[in-house]
Swiss-Prot record:
It catalyses: (6R)-5,10-methylene-5,6,7,8-tetrahydrofolate + glycine + H2O = (6S)-5,6,7,8-tetrahydrofolate + L-serine. This is Serine hydroxymethyltransferase. It is an enzyme of class 2 (transferase). Keywords: Amino-acid biosynthesis, Cytoplasm, One-carbon metabolism, Pyridoxal phosphate, Transferase. The gene is glyA. (6S)-5,6,7,8-tetrahydrofolate binds at residues 121, 125-127, 354-356. The keyword Lipoprotein does not apply. One of its GO terms (cellular component) is cytosol. It comes from Rickettsia africae (strain ESF-5). CDD domains: SHMT.
């Protein structure tokens, strides 16, 4: 058998069919999962390139394998482009994920048992910020800060009080479900008072930071981590940024050989492509549209009587609090899914329900904005979501309404382009 003549359709019909069906699913639903997006065909092409064949342990010009001349060029391009994008002095583009980017920073700056202070899961934080089931909660003495119980906004006074009390080695700013801006300068003030390191995890808002639509943490944080998908609209992966090159040197050693082995050179090439796209003027317009669309979505749901956490949004995330409506997040997300609208159940701050059930849903605008949705389209989407939620108030069997909304979704989504 000549492997170089094989294609997927002939080699593995089952996987080929799965990919075809997934393409159909992605093309036919309104995608509101806040952490998802659609990459360009150029990113897909780079990600599927033969660079996947190349082992390249180490860093450009310091590899443990020969034959790395071309992949060195690709990685250097990715590094230089992302440094320009975020206006920083140091970048590492090798992390396989945002979680591993965070782990590399921990490995570089902390010792087991050190205290870390991060946002609690139910307030919108991430597993890797000290949650008990995660490595960060097992290896370190994790302390959590919450949001204000009335406004649901970050409580900087509480963070300062906890920092004074616990003297963390690392203070973490960042979230996976928080719809408002973060004051990174205020975090740095707190850090300087207690002599801690400051890490900003901007996985969700990296695109906003890169385009100036959110305050940059680069001047304030010792290390900045992110994913390369979500609002950056690149391949799935991670990155680490800093203006402190001495810390950057520690992070390089922590990531390789400390945490990872060979980098994924096809993914790094795809990251470089995405960063080039992010440097174009139209990307800033895209991010501005993402934010405007989120505000339109939040307003349309508020008009229908639904509680939007914090009263609105500054970014791409809309959190719907369903406690007063007597609907669980799980029930709502499943019903919306059957109606062709994909989102996720999400905990609400101080949520007393199980994280597998939750009292809210998280909605996001990056993916549909990539397809061309504008504010008026998200107003329609908001009403579709509200229709489904209204139906659930009366009856958990929402099948008739789900079919009606699915028909509306189909008519709307057909107006917007997808991969050919």
């Amino acid at each position: 058998m000549n492997i170089f003549n094989n294609n997927l359709h002939e080699t593995d019909k089952e996987i080929n069919e799965i990919i075809k069906h997934e393409k159909l699913r992605q093309s036919s639903v309104i995608e509101l999962i806040a952490s998802e997006n659609f990459v360009s065909p150029a990113v897909l092409e780079a990600q599927g390139a033969l660079l996947t064949n190349k082992y390249a342990e180490g860093y450009p010009s310091k590899r443990f394998y020969n034959g790395c001349e071309e992949v060195d060029k690709a990685e250097n391009l990715a590094i230089e482009r992302v440094k320009k994008l975020f206006n920083c002095k140091y970048a590492n583009v090798q992390p396989h994920s945002g979680s591993q980017a965070n782990q590399a920073v921990y490995l570089a700056l902390l010792q087991p048992g050190d205290t870390v202070l991060g946002m609690s899961l139910d307030s919108g934080g991430h597993l890797t910020h000290g949650a008990a089931p995660n490595m960060s909660g097992k290896w370190f003495n994790a302390v959590s800060y919450s949001v204000n119980k009335e406004t649901y906004l970050i409580d900087y006074d509480e963070i300062e009080r906890l920092a004074d009390l616990h003297k963390p080695k690392l203070l973490i700013a960042g979230f996976s479900a928080y719809p408002r801006n973060i004051d990174f300068a205020k975090f740095r003030e707190i850090v300087d008072k207690v002599g801690a390191y400051f890490m900003a995890d901007i996985a969700h808002i990296a695109g906003l930071v890169a385009t100036g639509e959110h305050q940059s943490p680069i001047p304030y944080a010792h290390a900045v981590t992110s994913t390369t998908h979500k609002t950056l609209r690149g391949p799935r992966g991670g990155l680490i940024l800093s203006n402190d090159e001495a810390i950057g040197h520690k992070i390089n050693s922590a990531l390789f050989p400390g945490l990872q082995g060979g980098p994924l050179m096809h993914i790094i090439a795809a990251k470089a492509v995405a960063f080039l796209e992010n440097l174009q003027p139209e990307y800033k317009s895209y991010i501005q549209q993402v934010i405007s669309n989120a505000k339109a979505l939040a307003s349309s749901l508020q008009e229908r009587g639904y509680d939007i956490l914090t009263g609105g949004t500054d970014n791409h995330i809309v959190l719907v609090d369903l406690r007063k409506d007597g609907i669980t997040g799980k029930l709502a997300a499943n019903s919306l899914d059957r109606a062709g609208i994909t989102c996720n159940k999400n905990a609400i701050p101080f949520d007393e329900t199980s994280p597998f059930i939750t009292s809210g849903i998280r909605l996001g605008t990056p993916a549909c904005t990539t397809r061309g949705f504008k504010e008026k389209d998200f107003v329609l989407v908001g009403h579709m979501v509200a229709d489904i939620l209204d139906g659930l108030k009366n009856n958990e069997d929402n099948s008739a309404l789900e079919q009606k909304v699915l028909n509306e979704v189909t008519k709307l989504i057909e107006l917007f382009p997808f991969y050919g």
